[in-house]
Amino acid sequence: MLPPNTTESQIIANVGGGDMTTGSCASVALAYIGNKCGYDVCDFRGGESMNFFSRRRNLQEIVNSVGGVLESDVNDFKAAARLLQTIDVGKEYYFFCAKHAAMIKKNDNGEYMYLELQSAVNNGWKAFNQNVLKSRFGAQKSHTIYGQKTKLSAGLIDSELLANDSGFVDMLKYINTEQNKQRKGKSGSVK
């Protein structure tokens, strides 16, 4: 367990790092929520855990199991916009869309922010807008498979739903990695 006086900045420094391995965005955001709940969780895993969190359908199952919201559309921007409309000011949410997952929130002034946790040097809350959705999340206006338009899901979970879910601690155990078994992505560092 983390000391009760652990600050958000300390949590971001603890879980953030230059890990860009497949699926690490999805699990590091969950590790952040775990740390906010007081658990000492680091996310530098490999093997089956890495594969699990890189699959959209697994993220969809997590959203469904805890009572989050899914939106499907051929246009990622439209799906994201519908999800963003449901965000309450001051609350934090687990959000995935297109090729990325992150924590997201809306400030008192109505601005959306996302939590960068994969940078080797510059983690923290950043402005979230259409440009970020395109460049950081990889959002597209249309998805096709073999020439046919295809809908993809985007998901949103109130972090309090996750924190209160009976299976969340088990998920954190799956993410948490013993120091001698940690696998780092390019530019990752030991935490």
Task: Place the predicted regions along the sequence by residue.
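Short amphipathic alpha-helical segments that mediate assembly, nucleic-acid/protein binding
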Residues: 8, 26, 55-59, 77-80, ...
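Noncatalytic regulatory segments and standalone regulatory/sensor domains
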Residues: 114-115, 120-191
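Active-site-adjacent structural segments surrounding the nucleophilic cysteine of cysteine proteases
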Residues: 1-47
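Generic surface-pattern signal
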Residues: 17, 64, 89, 138, ...
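Conserved active-site-adjacent core of cysteine acyl-enzyme catalytic domains
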Residues: 35-101, 105-128, 132-135
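Weak global preference for isoleucine
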Residues: 11-12, 33, 62, 87, ...
